[in-house]
Amino acid sequence: MMTLIIPRKEAPVSGEGTVVIPQPAGDEPVIKNTFFFPDIDPKRVRERMRLEQTVAPARLREAIKSGMAETNAELFEFREQKIAAGFTRLADVPADDIDGESIKVFYYERAVCAMATASLYERYRGVDASAKGDKKADSIDSTIDELWRDMRWAVARIQDKPRCIVSQI
């Protein structure tokens, strides 16, 4: 939630006359993951996906946990193979580092962020029946599709698979 302050007309106003004060960020504890995959910090998800304080912490936490569970399920066989090869964490699996972070961990967090955000957007669509509302819904649908695509691509990158499989019929 946000606080919106609208000054009275008689008060001197500069600019548009409204000041938006975002709700102070509360304490959002890191979400613990399984032993193999990294924990997820809700603050990083908010920053990466530009969610700021527009989503309640409880809703964001639920969406992230769902994203983690689904991504973990998608990577179950990959995880089993890597554990059999002697790796105890995703961060231990050989991969390039960018900015001091394993590419595999980066893509894992990207997959979770994309899925959590897609899930939130699907549930936050408006019920506006006007032409403007329809156009906005189409734009949101496109964004949701792109987020699901990003999730699939990130999961493929973790597994060193191509982003898409094309076959001739």
Where are these regions (language model features)?
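A short linear-motif detector with a strong N-terminal bias
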Residues: A91, D99, I144-E146
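Short loop/turn elements at secondary-structure junctions
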Residues: K104-I169
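Amphipathic, non-membrane alpha-helical segments in soluble helical-bundle scaffolds
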Residues: F35, P57, S102, F106-R110
